[in-house]
Amino acid sequence: KPWCQVEDRKFLCPAPGYDRHFAITEHFGMKLIPVPMNENGPDMDVVEELVSSDDTIKGIWCVPKYENPMGIVFSDETIQRFANLKPLAKDFRIFWDNAYCVHSIYQNEETDIPDIISECEKAGNPDMVYEFCSTSKITFPGSGISAVASSPANLIDIKGFLKYATIGPDKINQLRHVRYFKNIAGIKAHMAKHADILRPKFEAVDKILNDELNGLGIAEWTKPNGGYFISFNTLKGCASDTVTLCSKMGVAFTPAGATYPYGNDPEDQNIRIAPTFANMKDIKLATKIFALSVKIVTLEKLINKAA
């Protein structure tokens, strides 16, 4: 039965997570159910309980490596528990967006994860996962090469839809990528150059946050080994006002709450920091403004609470 014909259809959304994932499933009429994250990935106790008890839950979003925005790498146990899920809905699917599969900032700390396709096959769930990746953050944003991996049965199904959407891929672009990279070693060498650009930016943000906020007990943030983001938590109720104050001083952030379904962070505390685009001078200034904004907003909240 097509999902569009299922009343009260639902989709699991690990959060903090990727706002565009949430927007896609919301656009298609899914009810979005947040799933808390921990240091190993989504809380699998919650995932297992939900999918085993509700056949209107049709899927879950996952970014298994350097997850956006927390930079978490799913543990082997988490991945194996995903592969061994026993969903009540027989058409339940894991949307495994491996967007940052080669995006390490520290090459010597590269973390390999189990292949979800193989794990699902071994667990007797070969059709349960779609895995995606692209070169959008490797070569050309929005115009690189993309790929999907799944079971033979799923790929036949996907091709059946794709043939009506497009005559075929851009084969010249495919050839361009193959000739440039040649093999996985070529991709890794290229990504090491990306890492050399990004690493100083991430380290500059982390240093300033430590200099300005460490030990105050008013914030915590991640120091990822890869990916594109730093996840920052204020005290409860301070994120929106912090982003607003930063905006008034010329520093723009993704809206507070964007990392949660419907843009609703129930604690109003998570902010996604993206140090990748700006130059080093602007990054340092913006981070100092951000840290100052966190202090001001937090102090105002604490004063008002004490009054």
Regions found by a protein language model. Give the residues of each.
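Conserved core of the PLP fold type I
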Residues: 1-90, 101-124, 291, 296-306
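Conserved glycine-rich beta-strand-loop-beta hairpin in the small C-terminal domain of fold type I
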Residues: 17, 192-206, 218-233
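Hydrophobic "anchor" residues on beta-strands that sit immediately upstream
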Residues: 59, 93, 130
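Walker B catalytic acidic pair
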Residues: 97-98
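Conserved core segment of the aminotransferase class I/II
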Residues: 118-199, 299
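PLP-dependent enzyme catalytic core of the Aspartate aminotransferase-like
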Residues: 125, 248, 262-307
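Helix N-cap motif at beta-to-alpha junctions
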Residues: 235-239, 278-280
